[in-house]
């Protein structure tokens, strides 16, 4: 029997983000997922090592790695459309859930127990909350990159995403802002000069 899961996942590289905005550099959901996994890992480690919190770091990273799985079937719906009203948002959440269930069903039964739980994440878990913050951090960093390249198209998005991140009242996010975000405004020569 043939299983299509990884062939579908490999198509993440063809699905573009920020479709309604002019970008100086396109971003696909595969590279975005890698960014979110790295940032979620950082936030989980900060929670555990800096603040003494309890979190499953591996689960956080795996939730992040698979957090865009549904989009290989649905595409990336622009945020203003996704959150236009409760009805659209609820319908889209249901569509995402069904797409994730379908994707999990594309794995051999022997693998589903170890992979499906990360595709069908527990959205109420602390690990998933860190992933959602990392997802927004990734978007914020994209805004910084675009603004640094002279693209003012991302100014409003940067402002609203930054406000959202601070409104989460997550010490891990504030720590990341203080310790790491300033470096995203530096050139390669400035980074090497530190």
Describe the residue ranges of each PLM region.
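Alpha-helical, largely C-terminal catalytic domains
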Residues: 1-194
């Amino acid at each position: 029997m043939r299983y299509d899961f990884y062939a579908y996942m490999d198509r993440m590289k063809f699905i573009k983000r920020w479709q309604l905005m002019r970008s100086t550099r396109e971003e696909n959901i595969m590279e975005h997922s890698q960014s979110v996994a790295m940032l979620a890992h950082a936030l989980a480690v900060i929670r555990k090592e800096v603040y003494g919190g309890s979190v499953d770091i591996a689960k956080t990273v795996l939730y992040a790695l698979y957090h865009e799985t549904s989009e290989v079937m649905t595409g990336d719906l622009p945020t203003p459309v996704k959150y236009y009203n409760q009805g659209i948002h609820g319908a889209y959440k249901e569509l995402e859930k069904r797409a994730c269930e379908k994707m999990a069903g594309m794995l051999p039964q022997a693998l589903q127990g170890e992979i499906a739980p990360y595709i069908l994440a527990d959205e109420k878990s602390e690990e998933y909350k860190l992933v959602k913050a990392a997802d927004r951090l990734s978007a914020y960093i994209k805004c910084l990159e675009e603004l640094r390249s002279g693209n003012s198209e991302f100014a409003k998005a940067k402002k609203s995403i930054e406000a959202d991140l601070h409104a989460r009242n997550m010490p891990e996010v504030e720590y990341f802002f203080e310790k790491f975000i300033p470096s995203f405004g530096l050139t390669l020569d400035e980074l090497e000069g530190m």
